[in-house]
């Protein structure tokens, strides 16, 4: 979704930070040069699974994240969540602990007169009561300051999550645009971007279902792999060519099984490479035609050094490079989803309403 909406807004560089802030979590992923970052393996609840997946960094910061003050007088937001039921205190469903949503309501970012589709109306008095008991009184602050501190703490956690995937890896987030999704993102995306130095934020109309739209609009794809261990100084070209031929045949069978027209098929090649004695490999893109170069091993090694330097700001160009696995991603481009064009309408003169809002920085 992030890549699609950035292109719709005229971005071709494809350097995108996608964020999704829902009720319980804040998810971050970084797209560089229109390429999705992939994990060779991931973890769920501490359990490692060996299935390649998109690299997503998740923290427990969402609209339902509960704010609390510990025994030492320090404010924390999340990872515990009020969930949908009972939900934030302002939902009037029995919840009595303050959340980010309650803080947004108290700060004027949410309209207390708005009635949701199921008839629910937000309760400011309940949000004030929860905020006063659990945050304002323990910190000796008024309710506006307390709500502002909850929002500030939550946003600082989200800034740190983005920096984990950018600054701490030598990537300058100021060179990226942000595509924000999730039901709660609209209240925080601009503040987060301003803190990091991102100059452009895209908040799609369907931000609340951004992830679901991405699945619906994504292309069909499947990855295949062959293990051929070799080094760039002594490349086993015969075994590699045999493996690539098998991978191409598997890919064509997969795409044919989906009835993907030939003109809508594409193959994305890569290999898993590392310096000797390194524990983790890097995914190195390549083209099968690279094997026809005068010295294909040297070509792959040089590209690996460049990739390593771009990710970690260092490379050992005198070291040999090991390649352990050869991969192909078979992609079948599906019919583009055409979003309806909405013609410009007539805006009524004057604001729909006014309300007080609290901003810490003012």
Model regions: which residues?
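Basic, amphipathic juxtamembrane/active-site segments
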Residues: 29-52
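Active-site rim segments in enzyme catalytic domains, especially the processed small/beta chain
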Residues: 37-40, 55-68
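Short Pro/Gly-enriched beta-strand edge/turn motifs at strand-loop
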Residues: 8-11, 47-51, 252
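C-terminal, non-catalytic interaction/recognition modules in large multi-subunit enzymes and RNPs
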Residues: 5, 13, 23, 62, ...
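Short beta-strand scaffold segments in enzyme catalytic cores
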Residues: 26-30, 65-69
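Short glycine-aspartate micro-motif
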Residues: 14-20, 56-58
């Amino acid at each position: 979704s992030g890549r699609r909406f950035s292109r719709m807004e005229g971005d071709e560089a494809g350097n995108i930070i996608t964020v999704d802030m829902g009720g319980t979590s804040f998810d971050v992923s970084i797209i560089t040069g229109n390429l999705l970052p992939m994990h060779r393996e991931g973890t769920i609840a501490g359990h490692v699974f060996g299935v390649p997946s998109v690299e997503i960094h998740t923290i427990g910061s969402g609209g339902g994240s509960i704010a609390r003050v510990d025994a030492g007088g320090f404010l924390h937001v999340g990872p515990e969540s009020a969930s949908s039921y009972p939900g934030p205190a302002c939902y009037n469903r029995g919840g009595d602990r303050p959340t980010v949503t309650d803080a947004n309501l108290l700060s004027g970012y949410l309209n207390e007169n708005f009635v949701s589709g199921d008839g629910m109306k937000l309760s400011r008095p309940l949000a004030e009561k929860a905020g006063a008991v659990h945050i304002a009184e323990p910190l000796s602050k008024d309710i506006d300051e307390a709500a502002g501190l909850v929002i500030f703490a939550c946003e600082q956690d989200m800034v740190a999550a983005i920096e984990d995937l950018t600054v701490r890896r030598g990537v300058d987030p100021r060179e990226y645009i942000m595509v924000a999704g999730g039901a709660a993102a609209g209240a925080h995306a601009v503040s987060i971007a301003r803190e990091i130095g991102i100059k452009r934020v895209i908040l799609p109309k369907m931000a609340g279902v951004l992830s679901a739209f991405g699945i619906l609009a994504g292309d069909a794809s499947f990855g295949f792999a062959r293990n051929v261990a070799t080094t760039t100084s002594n490349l086993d070209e015969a075994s590699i060519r045999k493996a690539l031929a098998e991978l191409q045949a598997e890919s064509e069978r997969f795409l044919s099984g989906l009835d993907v027209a030939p003109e809508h098929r594409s193959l994305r090649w890569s290999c898993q490479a590392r310096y000797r004695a390194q524990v983790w490999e890097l995914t190195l893109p390549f083209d099968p035609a690279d094997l026809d170069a005068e010295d294909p091993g040297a070509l792959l090694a040089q590209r690996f050094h460049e990739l390593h330097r771009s990710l970690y700001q260092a490379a050992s160009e005198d070291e040999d490079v090991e390649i352990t696995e050869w991969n192909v991603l078979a992609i079948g481009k599906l019919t583009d989803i055409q979003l309806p064009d909405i013609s410009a309408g007539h805006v009524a003169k004057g604001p729909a309403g006014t309300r007080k809002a609290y901003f810490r920085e003012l």
